[in-house]
Amino acid sequence: MVELKVKTEMDVDRNLCNYCGACVGMCPTDAIWLDETVIKIHEEKCIECGFCIVGCPTGAITAEWFHGNL
């Protein structure tokens, strides 16, 4: 049986992000990396654990699929 998983895009609010890198350190699959001016999320590597969302001190990362706290 094939399992299909629909992924929705994660959003990083550039006005809230202070580029501290906390999300990078929280990601267990190295799906997030920090450029000098941009947080990049590799959607194919993301396992939707929510660690980056909860670990962000400014609340800059959001996703439609994430509701609640870890």
From Swiss-Prot:
InterPro entries: 4Fe4S_Fe-S-bd, 4Fe4S_Fe_S_CS, Fe-S_Ferredoxin. Transmembrane segments: none annotated. [4Fe-4S] cluster 2 binds at C27, C46, C49, C52. SUPFAM superfamilies: 4Fe-4S ferredoxins (SSF54862). Disulfide bonds: none annotated. Residues 8-36, 37-66 form the 4Fe-4S ferredoxin-type domain. GO terms for molecular function: 4 iron, 4 sulfur cluster binding; metal ion binding; oxidoreductase activity. Binds 2 [4Fe-4S] clusters. Pfam families: Fer4. This is Probable ferredoxin TA0517.
